[in-house]
Amino acid sequence: MLPKYEEAGAKYYTHDGKGISDVLTFFKDEGMNAMRVRLFVDPKKQTTNNGKWETDYNVCQDLDWVKALGKRIKDKGMKFMLDFHYSDTWADPGKQWTPAAWASLDDNALAQKLYSYTKDALAQLKAAGAEPDMIQTGNEISYGMMWGQPTDAGSKLKRCWPSSPADNWTRFTNLLKQATKACREECPDAKIILHVERTSVSQQNDNKNHSALSNFYKKMKEASIDYDIIGLSYYPYFHGAISELEGAIDLLKKDYADKSVMVVEFGYPYAWAVGGTTYDYTKTYPYSDAGQKAITADVVTMLKKHENVNGLFWWWPEYNAMGTNLSGWYNAPLFDSYTGKATSALTELCKFGSSSTDINATIMNGKQEADNNYYTLSGQRVSTPSHGVYIHKGRKESKK
């Protein structure tokens, strides 16, 4: 949404109150090295869950928009993650509506349309100087994607719940195969991400013992879906304690050791509760600048213990109504809409991708000795080193 805020005259400042002339440059200087941008098929045809036409100011990212913003990101020397929504509006576990222009297609034709659309979009991005480095083939697709239209009867919708018919899952994986095929053909160096949000065992009833999460990636493996990275959403106010996210990561590391994990959506308020909050974490992390900073620091610390985790993205970090006529309703970005200042959490977030190491050293008898833990070359501590090169007692060691 950054171009919208720039056009509206939003005022951005550092945490110390110095003016920011270029937000992307500021993000990079602070330590961010990648940006994530969503893509809708035709946001002019967006509808509500009742099938009625609506205008959501925030649903505006068509291909031309993404080409322009993606090029800005690449020109800054940052990595670009493209988030295909494969819908005209928001896609998440509660709604995965088929684009209106594709509504009449049967399953085979829909799969072919998905392939051609994905391939063409990527070709246009490349031609515009905005080739993505990472590609999400769908957004929060825990329950499948392109179910049908919001006006369809519930029984007609092709949802993929754990209990859904096998035919629904087959249809879904056939769609994914066409999407990933297009990605490999057009952007062979890009990493493909499968993004879900079943990270909670306490707040998501179908995910006790992470059963829904496990079922999803089991289905992907059975269908031989081609991908590189497991993408997760984690919003503490919806998903519960940090330990729940860590439990999901532990399970994925055990069952899918060949896949990297990224938290592609994360956020926490600096002020009041986000609408629909189901988990109150405020005794530990109050809704304040300090509370937002503290939970971000603790999430980063936890993630850096896991060598299979290689990405952390804040959702909607640039939101800022300061100096505009826009609503200041959203209170979980990395800028305060009352002051325009960057929140303290931004600095903590950037520590995840910093080049500095968390390797500890101790002073014993006047002599410095490295600790006995193993670390990746980026400084992330690992519990049990597997194949690769690690730092141990201040030296590089190769594990075969």
Please identify what each model-predicted range represents.
Residues 1-26:
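Boundary/entry segment of secreted carbohydrate-active catalytic domains
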Residues 11, 154-156, 247, 251-258, ...:
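Aromatic-rich peripheral "rim/lid" segments of glycoside hydrolase catalytic domains that contact
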Residues 19-26, 62-69, 117, 121-124, ...:
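A general structural detector for well-ordered alpha-helical segments in enzyme core domains, enriched
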Residues 23-24, 170, 185-192, 199, ...:
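Glycoside hydrolase catalytic-domain groove-lining segments
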Residues 25-168, 173-193, 197-199:
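Substrate-binding cleft and catalytic face of glycoside hydrolase catalytic domains
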Residues 27, 83, 135, 230, ...:
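Conserved, mostly hydrophobic/aromatic
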Residues 107-108, 115, 119, 123-133, ...:
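Structural recognition of alpha->loop->beta junctions
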Residues 358-400:
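C-terminal outer-membrane/trafficking sorting elements
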